[in-house]
């Protein structure tokens, strides 16, 4: 297996929206699980205060990430309108095609750090670690 493509997006929530975010994210998880069979992992995490969340995605390649963005486009738009205050950082690990780089820069927006580490230095991926 080639090195995976890993995406970590960190977002500040609108005040008092953690419970609504959890409900919305549960719906998103169902959509991703049903419509993205190539996705290796898709998980969300919140800080203890419930003011910031991070979404961690592991894809087999950038094509999978681009497909993901098409699948969840409307959900992302809705989340920004009603739940997210702002994106605070985007981290990408793995090869990033030019089209994917443009997509990430658009997603990051102006002033949001887009951190890209494209050069693998080693590791492994277990697909059946259960």
Predicted regions and their residues:
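Conserved acyl-CoA
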Residues: 80
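Short S/T/G/P-rich N-terminal loop/turn motif that feeds into the first structured element of a domain
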Residues: 1-53, 60-74, 83-130
